[in-house]
């Protein structure tokens, strides 16, 4: 595992890499320093950091998605269901119908796929059955099963067995250029979770953005930490919650589903700053966070995640709104061919301070593979 260290402070401030690491970036950036890096699948263009990102940050990891297969040294597929307690209605797969690369774009495509092949131990055959999700109700202990007739795509810099491929430690700036899906129940996001502290939310979570397909103007950044339990004086009991959250809607002109935009986050020693199209739009200081351990722990790294969820409790109006698309089944036609339900990622890049920039004299080749499970 490679460790890139901060040359000034002598402490970890870079990416721990197994195989490779991930970077998120934007096409609107223009160069502050010339960076040429080849993977055998494309040369990194000259880029410039947005105003507000320190000029001593160097490009240390990237994926331009210029090949025809996912680079498995950098990413792995998320598989099966995700967050069924929120009543999400999809299964993540590694099927090319859900995760594909074409013309330099990564596509995470959600589709209405109501049936799946499942092994029947009685007949000893694979049989077509309804696609479903299951979870255990924490209050009653009852097992809940519900229809989940969609498939979709999600990737991360940790493999399906829990092995970290890349984590970014200390200060970094990460950015991605993305066009969002506009199917009503789509919940697309670029986010990060910490590797130390027992899993999210205790290990920290950074939502660079989350979106709602039915509302192109809804773009929200968020920070999750371990929850601070609060006592409800009226009910004389402690209110349980999943996490402490520090969300902020990001200003935009509403064309997030028809044009590419860049979404970035700058994590520093005392604060996190979110960027939209190269402009700083929201800063959260650690002094404002009640449970800040995950963000001040010098050993806690963050993996990168790109996700296209369908349905679930997030896809509705809050603050008195009436729109509700938590159940995607009435909108299944919006997921028939992928034309409306396609999350498109142009590239991802990460910069880190005082680190050795990515430069190569000669192209290097990358072997990529993919697998499909039923």
Protein language model regions, located:
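Hydrophobic helical h-region of N-terminal Sec-dependent signal peptides
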Residues: 18-24, 28
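Sec-dependent signal peptide cleavage junction
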Residues: 26-43
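GH16 jelly-roll
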Residues: 38-365
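Long, low-complexity Q/N-rich tracts
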Residues: 366-372
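Bacterial Sec-dependent N-terminal signal peptides
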Residues: 1-17
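Non-Sec secretion/translocation targeting segments of pathogen effectors
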Residues: 1-3, 22-24, 36-37
């Amino acid at each position: 595992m490679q460790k890139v260290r901060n040359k000034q402070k002598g402490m970890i401030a870079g990416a721990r890499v197994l195989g490779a690491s991930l970077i998120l970036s934007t096409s609107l950036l223009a160069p502050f320093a010339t960076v040429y890096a080849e993977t055998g699948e494309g040369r990194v263009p000259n880029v410039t950091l947005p105003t507000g990102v320190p000029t001593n940050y160097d490009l240390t990891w990237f994926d331009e998605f210029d090949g025809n297969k996912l680079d498995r040294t950098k990413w792995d597929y998320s598989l099966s269901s995700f967050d069924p307690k929120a009543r999400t209605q999809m299964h993540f797969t590694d099927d090319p119908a859900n995760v594909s690369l074409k013309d330099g774009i990564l596509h995470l495509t959600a589709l209405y796929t109501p049936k799946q092949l499942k092994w029947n131990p009685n007949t000893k055959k694979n049989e077509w059955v309804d696609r479903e999700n299951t979870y255990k109700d924490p209050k009653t202990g009852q097992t809940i099963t519900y229809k989940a007739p969609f498939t979709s795509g999600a990737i991360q810099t940790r493999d399906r067995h829990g092995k970290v491929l890349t984590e970014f430690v200390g200060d970094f700036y990460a950015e991605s250029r993305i066009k969002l899906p506009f199917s009503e129940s789509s919940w697309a996001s670029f986010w990060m979770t910490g590797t130390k502290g027992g899993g999210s939310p205790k290990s920290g979570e950074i939502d660079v953005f989350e979106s709602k397909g039915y509302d192109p103007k809804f773009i929200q950044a968020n920070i999750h930490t371990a929850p601070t339990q609060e006592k409800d004086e009226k009910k004389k009991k402690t209110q349980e919650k999943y996490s402490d959250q520090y969300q902020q809607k990001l200003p935009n002109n509403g064309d997030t589903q028809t044009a590419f935009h860049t979404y970035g986050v700058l994590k520093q020693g005392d604060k996190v700053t979110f960027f939209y199209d190269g402009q700083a739009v929201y800063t959260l200081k650690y002094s404002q966070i009640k449970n800040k351990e995950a963000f001040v722990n010098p050993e806690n790294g963050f993996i990168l995640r790109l996700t296209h969820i369908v349905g679930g409790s997030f896809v509705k109006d809050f603050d008195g709104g009436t729109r509700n698309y938590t159940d995607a089944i009435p909108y299944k036609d919006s997921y028939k061919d992928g034309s409306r339900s396609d999350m498109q990622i142009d590239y991802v890049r990460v910069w880190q301070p005082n680190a050795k920039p990515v430069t190569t004299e000669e192209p290097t080749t990358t072997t990529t593979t993919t697998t499909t499970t039923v």
